Amino acid sequence: MKNKYERLFEGLNLQENETLLNRIYTQLYIIEGESEGVNEQHEVLQMEKTARTQHSQDTPIYCNDIFKASPEPGREEKHQIKTVLTKGIAGIGKTVSVQKFILDWAEGKANQDVDFMFVLPFRELNLIRDHQYSLDRLLLDFHPELQDLDSKIYEECKVVFIFDGLDESRITLMFSDAQEVSDVTETSSVGVLISKKVSDVTEISSVGVLMSEKVSDVTETLSVGVLMSKLMTGDLLPSALIWITSRPAAANQIPSKYINRLTEIQGFNEPQKEEYFRNRISDEHQASRIISHIRRARSLHIMCHIPVFCWISSTVLQKLLKEDLSAEIPQTLTEMYIHFLLIQINMRNQKYEERDPEKLLQSNREVIVKLAEVAFKQLMKGNVMFYEEDLRESGIDVTDASVYSGICTEIFKEESVIHQRKVYSFIHLSFQEFLAAFYLFYSHVIKNKKPLDEFRSYRSDEDPLDDEESLDDEDPLDDLLTTAVDKALWSENGQLDLFLRFLLGVSLESNQKLLQDLLTHTENSSESIRETTQYIKEMIKGEDEDEDEEQDEFLSSETSINLFLCLLEVKDQSLSREIQEFVKSDKHSEKFLSSSHCSTISYMIQMSEEPLDELNLMKYNTSAEGRRRLISAVINCRKAL
């Protein structure tokens, strides 16, 4: 276990990216409980909210202490913590925390009362989801070195099971009170084994028998889904400790009654951001300059709560400053991601044998567009992990998939998992969203109607838009952009919010020029962007003073803030300046403010480097909901009334 987990690979698992985990590890901010509204917004917007709001009841927890209970107020005894669910957005450090937890145990630094730790990543369990297994057989497949152990040892020893990446699961978990399992050798399909009990250690149960019997043997065969469910509920190996990690939107798959402790990884706080850059960048002067730049660019600064984004930023900024100390440094998310993509393409060019510039350009375009198509199609399906069949759907020959991952080593990764099956993913969800946005804009530029119509027909359960209507025959850019705004407003959990920011950013002419080697041509987008930003500003401000309460609450606070950040992504500062002037003025009661406008004002106050002298909520002409949304601004005010 020590050999497996002592090294951290930032980006793809290539030797040049290898770093000793103990050297670079920066303690993450893990709290007990969860931040307010964690399931109601896009993951990145959750980080925006975390950056603005501190909860006095937050209890920081070190990852090695997640099973250690704190005494409750008024009670000296500590309750037993058996099952922990840790939530956190993509790239926030869930898997690295698991890695550190195991490494410290293997090195004898923590949790020495534990005899065995077993890591069962859902991305690997997916590959055997249709198979029948006993727990004993499953553990042998994952850890062949256990071959000589008696299966009874699992019941006699202290065991920790770690289920990493519930959000990546394609397995149906079953939590029926009528089905119970408690033997580690009972064989079952992944889903069924979890919920049934059997008393014979060698019994093989069919699904039908499984539903009506109890299971208590680790050698009995069940479905993988049932097996996992039974471990989580404690019906199988009730003394085992369970740690489950998940992105927030998927965490509700497990009934709360089976969870003893809920934790949330909130990523880096302010000192930890700086610590990360100083650990990673050996040149102290360069590290200070990069930290200073990120602090000035607020959207970049907030995103650096996410460790993966810190890595992308340090990669880009180190490269730019190494080539030219006076280089213009990216100010927006889209600019940062474009530069990261260009760095990877240049690395590929240095390795590639082709010397003909035109052939090299064509090859780069084909590779990136293929990967971008995968990103777009899978984003529309809500997938972050892909298998061979998903790649074939986008026209990528699976025999070439390793070539693709080798070409853009930090963008698209291939991993061998159980039974040496391959799984594929982008380095981070946000990079998938960036490439998906690029692909949609690229399709617009080359007049490829199919992806445009596929996007138009995309809808969530909440979406009232007519999915039969195609985009305008002429496909004007403003039609595409305003359609994207509407789609993002109705997408579940804000899953298109960051995609929208990237789509607007990519369409900006200055960014088109950066991408000119990948686009067949650029187009004049200034008027389309002007019309789209006007549409966004009208939506934020609201038009009707007499709007009813339901209309007033149509845009959530997080959606309103994302729309505001979309304006900054295309470098439209007009609303930002208008709000700054409004807040400083004495004219708060002259104009009615929509709830969305109040969310944006609150966000601006909180993001300001300089605290507001006084915030008097009663002076604002708004609804009760609007006033409620202004309350969060008091965190950056010297006086509140």
Question: Could you tell me what each predicted segment is?
Answer:
Residues 1-641:
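Intracellular innate-immune signaling modules
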